[in-house]
Structures are given as C-alpha cells and as structure tokens.
Swiss-Prot record:
Keyword terms: Cytoplasm, DNA-binding, Transcription, Transcription regulation
Keyword Lipid biosynthesis: no
Name the record gives this protein: Probable transcriptional regulatory protein ASA_2843
Molecular function terms from GO: DNA binding
Biological processes annotated in GO: regulation of DNA-templated transcription
Record-linked NCBIfam families: PRK00110.1, PRK12378.1, YebC/PmpR family DNA-binding transcriptional regulator
Main location: cytoplasm
Location within or outside the cell: Cytoplasm
Amino acid sequence: MAGHSKWANIKHRKAAQDAKRGKIFTKLIREITTSARIGDPDPANNPRLRAAVTAALTSNMTRETINRAIARGAGGGDGEQLETIVYEGYGPAGSAVMVECLTDNRNRTVAEVRHAFSKSGGNLGTDGSVAYLFSKKGLLTFVGVDEDALMDAALEAGADDVVTEEDGSIEVYTTPNDFGTVLDALEAAGFKAQNAEVTMIPSTEAELDAETAPKLMRLIDMLEDLDDVQEVYHNGSISDEVAATL
C-alpha cells in the first residue's frame, strides 16, 4: 500500500478539475441513483450507496440534491437504466488501469474507452488482465490527528489496517462492507476524515518517470472526460519531484 498517496493525489487533482467543469456532480448523481435502484435505498444498509453519498458530501453536494437522487433511483420507473461495467487495460511503463463505467450502451462505451487507450499509447486488455493487481477497499484519510488515538478507535471499529504516510497523513483501510460502520464510529469519536471513499488499491506499483508520467495523465484525462466513465484506478507511482511538474 506504500505510495498510495502518490497516485491518489493525481486522482484528487483531476477531481478538482472535473468539479470546475461541473462533471463530477453529474457522475455522482448517476452513481447515487443507480445504487439506490439496484439496492436498498437506505445508505445504512447499502455500502455502495453509502460510499456514493459520502463522496457527494465530500464534494459539497447538498443533502437535498442527494435525497432527490436516492428517491429517483428508489422509485424505479422509466428513468435511465444503467449498468456497471469495468474495463481493464495497460498504460505507459506497463501500468495497470481499471476503468469503472455506468452505461446504457456497451458498444458506445467500449469504443470510447478503447480509443482513449490507443490515443495515449496504451491498450485495452481482456477481463481479468489487471484486476488481480487490485483489491477493493474502503479508504479514509485523516490529517492533523493523534495517530495512536485514531489507530485505537479505527481498529476497535473494525478497520483492517491503519497506515501513516510520509507526509504525516493517516490512512484507514476497511472492507467495502465495513466502510460506513467504521466511518460512523470514527466520526462519533471526533475524527473527521479529509477524504472517504471505496476505491481500488493496487498490490504492486509501476514506477513512472518524467517521460511516462505525462502519458499516464493524458490517458486518465481522456478517460475521465468520457461521460460514461465514473472512476479510473491505476497503479502508477510518481515521485513528488515528477508530480510537481504535471
């Protein structure tokens, strides 16, 4: 898990850009609506919905907007029927890339994703080609808190692991199903997460340099600009020096 923050920072940088374009709200609402449609409309009983609601709140979406999206999904009806599809592929320096999509047209989506890979010097793989390199986990990030107190509270709440990064931030890992429970317990104990999400954590990393890092960024940009793409995960590791130039 070491180095997770390095590639997470890329995602957070891109998320900020998306927010400026207004795209992130659209994608969050689609995820909330779909999660409520295919599962329990109560976030407390639906880990996927809870994660989507948490992400929306982190992005400053109002409770009213979130509740409307949940109600629309729970109501079913003739609304947009979307399915989740995950594509796998390879980026520069052999980096592994997973692309999570919500779509109503598989043919359109796979064509757009394949085009992004080919234009960025990567290639779309087959099912299972890189998925084995990732594990789905809940991730809560904290800054400026007492490390020992947080660790005790997190482990008592059922967290899998607690890791202190080089920059002093503390990352708490959970199973996807325990994400909401641990988040609630830590908030009740007075710990406010700077970021909380269910994400894909790589087991190995691909080191990227000043030449290959911009190519990965181009691929991520192209993929996240696609309307059907919800999330992009990768195992590229970029040093602080190289990241500062991006």
